[in-house]
Amino acid sequence: MALLPFTLPLAELEVGHHLYWQIGNLNLHGQIFLSSWILIGALLAFVLVGTKNLSRDPKGAQNLLEFLWDYIRDLSRDQIGEKYYREWLPFIGTLFLFIFVSNWGGALIPWKVIELPEGELGAPTADINTTVAMALLVTLAYFYAGLSKKGWRFFELYVEPTPIMLPFKIIEEFTKPLSLSFRLFGNILADELAVGVLVYLVPLIVPLPVMLLGLFTSAIQALIFATLAAFYIGEGLHEAH
């Protein structure tokens, strides 16, 4: 018996047009792969430039990279703890940098210059597939962290302080990736749509404040995602966090 008088396939819900790559029976969003690798390539190039001639008196790209490293290190240490944060620092740093570069790249890079057969390039984090994939990756990291350090005792936290908490703890595990993915996706997509509408209606001065606000929001969203990822991992590692 159907609960609704219509069907609503989630896979058919889209915003805008997309370039698809057909691999067997699987449809891949081609423009997301393209924009992701362009941004990853730009990030790697910046890192290579910043670490080419290391100096004790850092300047330019090296100075910025060292600032980011110190910031991510402090964030990871605060959320995960002094004992375990070093082994998770590359993971948290990669998440933060990819999201930050993706968010800012979607706002600053003139993607429309690159023409595609269908659809257009944009911020990878404005696509729900990207944010859900990263949220699930954080969830897997959370379970791996807990099981690798505590073994099966990890699941004791689901019945602490009382077994009555079990259903609530299970629901919480589903809400974690949902909140991570939809918060990031919704904010970045809304920013892109707002800027796009304003540029179309008032193409000169008015969109600039909104674009600047979008850059600030994009940086905050990267920070929130990385902080929550580190917190969840720390929660899985410690008896009480």
Curated annotation (Swiss-Prot):
GO terms for cellular component: plasma membrane-derived thylakoid membrane; proton-transporting ATP synthase complex. Keywords: ATP synthesis, CF(0), Hydrogen ion transport, Ion transport, Membrane, Thylakoid, Transmembrane, Transmembrane helix, Transport. Coiled coil: none annotated. The chain crosses the membrane at residues 30-50, 89-109, 128-148, 193-213, 214-234. It is a multi-pass membrane protein. GO terms for molecular function: proton-transporting ATP synthase activity, rotational mechanism. It is found in: Cellular thylakoid membrane. InterPro entries: ATP_syn_F0_a_bact/chloroplast, ATP_synth_F0_asu, ATP_synth_F0_asu_AS, F0_ATP_A_sf. PROSITE patterns: ATPASE_A. Its main location: membrane. The keyword S-adenosyl-L-methionine does not apply. Pfam families: ATP-synt_A. HAMAP family: ATP_synth_a_bact. Key component of the proton channel; it plays a direct role in the translocation of protons across the membrane. NCBIfam families: ATP_synt_6_or_A (TIGR01131). F-type ATPases have 2 components, CF(1) - the catalytic core - and CF(0) - the membrane proton channel. CF(1) has five subunits: alpha(3), beta(3), gamma(1), delta(1), epsilon(1). CF(0) has four main subunits: a, b, b' and c. Belongs to the ATPase A chain family. This is ATP synthase subunit a. The lineage of its organism: Bacteria, Bacillati, Cyanobacteriota, Cyanophyceae, Synechococcales.
